[in-house]
């Protein structure tokens, strides 16, 4: 049997599920995904429009399938739907052993609804149900953004018995609304007669983008106190989110009543954990966010960094909420408008995924045009 990397094995033993934030057909065909499962403790996969756009634009892996779809008269949207759901279905199949071994907690693959629907509740619900049926795998997650329009969609999709990955969460306030949407969805699922133990959810809390935005504002202020706070907000924000998670899923009567009927916790997932600032440790958003019942989805570069030199020292989150709040108090005191920061990040997050989706449309259209010649 192949040995797991000790650093990543230690991370897993501390209660953090290691997921890969990437997917391509090359990765599936080459056996690379299976290799990461066997040697780097990977037990899940997340995707987004940027990842699929990158996969489609590199090489010729998809040419034959797109040519076949073009011959059948498939349009751009249908082609994207087929190509992406085929990859996700294949990844789901690769991860079945991890899904079975974890009683459905891990072995998960996420696919995102069209980001152009981020502010349209009913269309998001409709597409989530369609994607669930097309992929047709029990270890699938449907990714729905935590926009105001996304929140009721999350509840409605969970109520259908569909597992959901809530994405683009930046603030603790919005995270509370996400947990409320989860509990509402599970209550409706119970009323509809669904088996609650089979419905899973994670809440994807974005980390590095918070530092990127706040550091930019701290640099503009330029005082010594401001500069000393650089690189602290992302981790502090996530630690406050974890304290809020425990408050809801360990202490609330509302969750307890669902737990009796088999409902699982909605695990926090640390997303955007690739370090963007070269001044910071490239394992910062992994080693500083170790906590039980969490997921960390990482680009392969970050997984490799943790494997090579990540120092895992057990739980680095529980009991840190007061220190994390102190960081936020200091940020507020020197003039950082956190409400504005989180609003900007949500809007920017949706816009980035929309831009990637539009690039994916253009890339696919070019492939279809080439195939038709």
From Swiss-Prot:
InterPro entries: Aldolase_TIM (IPR013785), TAL/FSA (IPR001585), Transaldolase_2 (IPR004732), Transaldolase_AS (IPR018225). Its EC number is 2.2.1.2. The keyword Transferase applies. GO terms for cellular component: cytosol; extracellular region. Pathway: Carbohydrate degradation; pentose phosphate pathway; D-glyceraldehyde 3-phosphate and beta-D-fructose 6-phosphate from D-ribose 5-phosphate and D-xylulose 5-phosphate (non-oxidative stage): step 2/3. The gene is tal. One of its GO terms (biological process) is pentose-phosphate shunt. The lineage of its organism: Bacteria, Bacillati, Actinomycetota, Actinomycetes, Mycobacteriales. This is Transaldolase. It catalyses: D-sedoheptulose 7-phosphate + D-glyceraldehyde 3-phosphate = D-erythrose 4-phosphate + beta-D-fructose 6-phosphate. Keywords: Cytoplasm, Pentose shunt, Schiff base, Transferase.
